[in-house]
Amino acid sequence: MIGTLQSGGVSKSIVNLLNVMDRTTYDVHLLLLDRAGDILSPYLPSDITVHVNREIENLHRGLRGVRALLFTGHLLLAFGSLLRMLMSKISRAWAGRWLAYLMPRFTDLTFDLIIDYGGQQQLYYMVDKLDGKKKITFFHNDYSKWPYYYAADRLYYPKVDQILSISQTCVDVLKAYFPDCKDKISVMQNISSPVLITKQANETVDLPIAPLLLVSLGHIMRRKGTDFSIDAAKILQKNGVEFKWMLVGKVVEKDLIRRIEQEGLADRFVVLGIRSNPYPYIKAADIYVHPARFEGKSIALDEAKILCKPIIVTNFSTVNDQFEDRVNASICEMNGDALADAIIELAANKELRQSYVAYLNAHIVDNSSEVEKLYTFID
């Protein structure tokens, strides 16, 4: 079960997971809560059953969904959805529980294993409304940076068979928040396929031309550090660095695009928006820059590692689960000055860039076997 199949890391992660599952042995179903912005469904295996429900979709679509519910005669659901939007201003946890309550039961099937891949209302819906012999929930981030649903999670985590997260740091944080559940909290990494990523990276795309080509993959928003990128770009431009910076991802905070224009950086940034295949842009870049404020275990960074790019990354709480400073990446402080300094240094230091590339080349890992952790829960 997943919320959307947009361009985010969780969406890409579940697509990768579904592609490596043993579908000759298991009958695999996917409940997709909302098809809005879906760009990854072409990459789903053709032999899985995808379930969608119009009422569930409209409950996830804000005021537009309320209008659709009214138009189709679902007056109580429309009122309930409005109430949920008001509740979310007070408590995301209870708004999430209310949304799960509103979501209709989509099937009477009993599953051997149900996996909630997104948490929050998906977790509550899975526990309360779906029949499964075993139930697993995922949390794809550092819980200390995203504790908004704690009041509800503490009631629902004891009801599932396993709680999975994507790195040891994330697991340790979950155990600190939910000590009574610590024995059923464990690691399952995001799955990234080197073969598939390398193949997709060879597709032809139009690219900007510059002596220094940078790329960042992620939503354009402060959480992903786009403001740090703008600050750094100002410094690079002031220092006479000739560069283009590709931003691949959904524009979430539009004021950041306005700021790019106001700062006179419109000819420096290339805002590409959402791309179903971002890998040619990563492959073409001289440096991959990841300025996020926090992450769980970034699948975008795993992909940049597979493509063996020199990487600059900020020192968010889980960064050491993926990187060692000056071994396989340059790790910098979370501000524009530090980011600019790291870019200038790495762009000028060919030997350092080559050392990162050599290390990454020697440590490419296909972790498709992670899927076997799920099979242990099926009788």
Q: Each predicted region: which residue ranges?
A:
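A conserved mid-protein helix/loop that constitutes part of the nucleotide-sugar donor-binding site
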Residues: 11-16, 212-235, 247
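Glycosyltransferase donor-sugar binding loop
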Residues: 30-38, 217, 221-223, 244-256
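Donor nucleotide-sugar binding/catalytic pocket of nucleotide-sugar-dependent glycosyltransferases
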Residues: 134-140, 144, 158-199
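A short, well-ordered alpha-helix in the C-terminal region of glycosyltransferases
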Residues: 237, 338, 345, 352-367, ...
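Aromatic "clamp/platform" in nucleotide-sugar-dependent glycosyltransferases that forms part
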Residues: 274, 293
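Short acidic/histidine- and often glycine-rich active-site loop of Leloir-type glycosyltransferases
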Residues: 303, 315-326, 330-331
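Short hydrophobic beta-strand element within catalytic cores of glycosyltransferases
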Residues: 310-314
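Conserved acidic donor-binding segment of nucleotide-sugar-dependent glycosyltransferases
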Residues: 325-326, 330-337, 345-350
